């Protein structure tokens, strides 16, 4: 029997090398898991609560918040116990000082272009809350700046992180229902005022200039984005839309309901966007040549095949980096994923803006708009 000499110098060196390798591995993993350094632009979007909660949990490193309204500084400082040093009124001064990895927009949709005007020449990527812009003209300006200065401009949609939607997409790509023939998206809720949105959020959300429209922009963008994704970036050939004003006393300036028909060469999309649903809804139906898929919510899917075989399933949880906007953003900036042909990409969201612009023109004129 050979006895191992624990005091042999070679064994000591091996232990040292193993220990060093372990330390390097741990250090590398720790570095890889460091939260992304961001600047937040704007505090008048109610989605801000999500990112500030993540900051307090250490999920994201917010190095500064730029908001011209100091009243909102105090509001969110008190709610989330934030230091005064985090707040600024000037975005350009803040990003020059802190040099963040990205800027996250939580301001009025019409002001997204202002963020890009500041960040693009400085080479700083931007992610905004949906939709990309209030108007197609603003979106084209964003696209031009992003191209000129070679930055990423991404758009965050809640539904991008729905496991059920990703599962439906994957099943379609695997030819489980044949070619897409019809897509139906229902999105909305009882109304922003009815569900308790803050006055600062309501101020711009119900303004035709600051939001670009009412429910048409607010919730029509979801269906337009999903259909662009399902059609793999194909542009539609025509758009027809009807908007309604069911609650003029509450929303005097903008539509509160929109129905949008999107025509593709061999498929049709129907978007039903409203502030008049009896409950909050985000679901997606896809009819194929020989089957039907319905993402009922974030997780649950029902199906029906031509032979009348019915089924249901719970989608598997999404895995990184397509399971969370911050993880996704980090992966794009690290060139681990392209961010050029998905729901968040600028390429797809320019098509979204073309659809929304055509829908507004169609609703105003009563005509089918050919793209």
Predicted feature residues:
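Bacterial N-terminal signal peptides that target proteins for export
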Residues: 2-18
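Bacterial N-terminal signal peptides
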Residues: 17-27
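N-terminal Rossmann-like dinucleotide-binding module
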Residues: 26-81
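Beta-loop-alpha module in the N-terminal Rossmann-like domain of NAD(P)-dependent dehydrogenases
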Residues: 80-145
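C-terminal helix-rich "cap/oligomerization" subdomain common to oxidoreductases
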Residues: 102-104, 331-371
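Rossmann-fold dehydrogenase core element
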Residues: 141-159, 179-181
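Predominantly a Rossmann-like dinucleotide-binding segment in NAD(P)-dependent oxidoreductases
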Residues: 162-242, 246-250, 366
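Contiguous beta-strand/loop segments that form the cofactor/metal-binding neighborhood of enzyme cores
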Residues: 225-300, 327-338, 358-359
């Amino acid at each position: 029997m050979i006895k191992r000499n624990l005091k042999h110098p070679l064994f000591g060196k091996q232990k040292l090398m193993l220990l060093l390798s372990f330390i390097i591995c741990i250090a590398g993993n720790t570095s890889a898991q460091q939260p992304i350094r961001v600047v937040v632009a704007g505090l008048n979007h109610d989605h801000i609560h999500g990112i500030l909660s993540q900051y307090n949990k250490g999920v994201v490193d917010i190095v500064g918040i730029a908001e011209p309204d100091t009243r909102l500084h105090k509001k969110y400082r008190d709610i989330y116990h934030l230091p005064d040093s985090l707040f600024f009124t000037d975005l350009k001064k803040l990003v020059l000082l802190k040099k963040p990895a990205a800027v996250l927009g939580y301001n009025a949709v019409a002001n997204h272009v202002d963020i890009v005007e500041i960040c693009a020449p400085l080479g700083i990527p931007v992610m905004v809350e949906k939709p990309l812009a209030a108007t197609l003209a603003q979106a084209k300006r964003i696209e031009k700046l992003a191209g000129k200065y070679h930055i990423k401009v991404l758009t965050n949609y809640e539904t991008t992180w729905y496991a059920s939607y990703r599962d439906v997409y994957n099943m379609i790509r695997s030819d489980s229902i044949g070619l897409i023939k019809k897509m139906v998206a229902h999105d909305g809720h009882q109304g922003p005022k009815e569900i308790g949105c803050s006055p600062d959020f309501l101020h711009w959300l119900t303004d035709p200039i600051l939001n670009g429209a009412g429910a048409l922009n607010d919730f029509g963008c979801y269906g337009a984005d999903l259909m662009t994704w399902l059609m793999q970036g194909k542009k539609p050939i025509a758009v027809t839309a009807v908007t309604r004003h069911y609650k003029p006393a509450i929303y005097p300036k903008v539509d509160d309901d929109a129905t949008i028909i999107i025509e593709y060469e061999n498929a049709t999309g129907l978007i039903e966007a409203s502030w008049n649903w009896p409950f909050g809804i985000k679901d997606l139906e896809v009819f194929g040549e020989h089957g039907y898929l319905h993402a009922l919510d974030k997780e649950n899917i029902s199906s029906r095949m031509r032979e009348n075989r019915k089924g249901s399933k719970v989608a598997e949880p999404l895995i990184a980096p397509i399971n969370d906007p911050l993880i996704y953003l980090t992966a794009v900036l690290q060139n681990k994923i392209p961010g050029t042909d998905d729901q968040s990409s600028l390429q797809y969201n320019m098509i979204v803006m073309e659809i929304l612009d055509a829908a507004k023109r169609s609703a105003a004129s009563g005509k089918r708009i050919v793209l």
